[in-house]
Amino acid sequence: MDIEERLTWLDEEYLSHYDANEVEVHSQIQLQKPFDAVVSERRTYPITEDEPEEKHTYLSYNKVVGTVLDRELYQAFSILDYVLVSAPGAPVRQALIDAGIGEDVYGSFEDGMLQPMFSIVAKNADESDQTRFVQIIEETLQKLVKEGLNQDSLLAGINSAEFRFREADYGQFPKGLLYGLQCMESWLFDDTKPFIHLECLDTLQFLREQIKTGYFEDLIQKYLLCLLYTSPSPR
């Protein structure tokens, strides 16, 4: 391929017809407008013809949490995911399991976008349990805000996060690759903040100092107290 010939053609036939100064590109990702009220959505997913639809519903409770550029929120909700849902005996997960909602309950904090999302999911639940699912989550969260979170669980979550950061054991993946991806989580949205989530030790120490102050309970009250659930359908 004659590269010079191709580039000349591109310039003569296309690029030379435009002035770069006349092209205004709005590349900044805008914040999503918040809902005025709780929104309930129903979506279906495919299953095989011989699979029953009963007890194949996923119930999901989802909340937007600030922006990925807030380093304290970024770390704090990773800790809250552990404390509320992921740790053994975590109160929200245990409350849903004890109520017989779903065969399994798990949480996630999706932080690879401008507006991170905190989710609590009940797997293989009954569609009719939608109202109870939300009610149990919110009643449990309200109780935790009132009575306080288990401080040992908070400390364990923070210490675990610090250990994983210091160990930096990413298995088969190169450490540099994972560091680069973590940089992109903030860099994509602010050119001046590529390293805020790598510089996390000070943030974790700050969170450690907040355990007894009601900081985490205030975050639950502010951000967690919309619902999305999916149900199966034959392909």
Walk through the language-model features, giving the residues of each.
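Charge-rich, well-structured scaffold segments of protease-associated domains
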Residues: 1-36, 52-76, 82-231, 235
